[in-house]
């Protein structure tokens, strides 16, 4: 047994199934590859890999989107220090039926381009003022002030209210015509993860009020963030 294997917890036979199921649910119903790599970073058993490969989730088989997945994010070297640059974008919309009436929800995503740390927050409107407030609450109030803020030419980002916030904090405005490929890939993964989580949560228990629908979307966003932070990051090799 290698030193790496000694550093991990051993999972008894009777507990393996429960551990696999628990991690699969907590990580937002990931695919087998991501589930296997994440579990094998923490636990050891000679038959663990085989049992993970045989694991089947009834909810995933019935309600997750079918077709080609988003795959792995490409590895790359870190060329900037953490907290220097944040890339922001909007993801969604996701459709949720409330009393059989379709409603749409979107979210603001903020990504530290060095570490790939992600923050997600549901938005009510796409106005520059609302996005400004959400960015301040979600990122600026929690982390060191970034040097640069990268975004596309969406009106919510180039609007007067959002630009005022960047000037107030002396953050360099970087309006990119071509989105950051790395951040764009993360946004796509976020979108699909949230949508899959929503499908699993909502099935059999559709929200009857708008308040309940918002709570469900918030739970899905939190699950997606947790999944991104705790699963193996292929871009950083850890």
Model-derived regions, located:
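A short, polar/charged loop-to-alpha-helix boundary motif
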Residues: 128-137
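Conserved beta-strand elements of beta-rich interaction domains across eukaryotes
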Residues: 93, 114-116, 154-156, 178-181, ...
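Nucleic-acid-interacting cores, centered on viral/eukaryotic replication and modification enzymes
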Residues: 104-105, 111, 134, 161, ...
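Loop/turn elements at helix/coil->beta-strand transitions in domains of secreted/extracellular proteins
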Residues: 144-146, 169-172
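RNase H-like two-metal-ion nuclease catalytic core shared by retroviral integrases
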Residues: 151-153, 157-166, 173-196, 217
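Basic, alpha-helical interaction scaffolds
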Residues: 13-34, 172, 188, 192-207, ...
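RNase H-like DDE catalytic core and adjacent DNA/metal-binding regions
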Residues: 1-118, 123, 140-147, 228, ...
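Charged alpha-helix within mobile-element recombinases
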Residues: 39-58, 188-237
């Amino acid at each position: 047994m290698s030193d790496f294997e000694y550093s991990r917890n051993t999972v008894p036979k009777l507990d393996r199934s429960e551990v696999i199921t628990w991690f699969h649910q907590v990580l937002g119903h990931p695919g087998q590859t991501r589930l296997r790599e994440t579990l094998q970073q923490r636990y050891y058993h000679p038959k663990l890999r085989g049992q993970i490969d045989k694991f089947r989730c009834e909810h995933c088989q019935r309600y997750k989107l079918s077709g080609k997945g988003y795959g792995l994010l490409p590895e790359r070297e870190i060329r900037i220090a953490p907290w220097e640059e944040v890339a922001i974008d909007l993801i969604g919309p996701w459709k949720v039926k409330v009393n059989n009436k379709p409603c749409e929800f979107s979210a603001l995503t903020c990504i530290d381009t060095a570490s790939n740390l992600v923050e997600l927050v549901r938005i009510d409107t796409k106005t520059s003022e609302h996005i400004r407030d959400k960015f301040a609450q979600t990122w600026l109030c929690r982390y060191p002030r970034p040097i640069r803020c990268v975004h596309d030419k969406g009106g919510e980002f180039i609007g007067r209210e959002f630009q005022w916030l960047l000037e107030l904090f002396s953050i360099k405005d970087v309006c990119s015509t071509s989105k950051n490929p790395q951040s764009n890939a993360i946004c796509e993964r976020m979108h699909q993860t949230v949508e899959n989580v929503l499908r699993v949560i909502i099935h059999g228990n559709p929200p009857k009020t708008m308040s309940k629908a918002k709570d469900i979307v918030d739970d899905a966003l939190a699950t997606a963030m947790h999944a991104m932070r705790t699963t193996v990051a292929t871009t950083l090799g850890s």
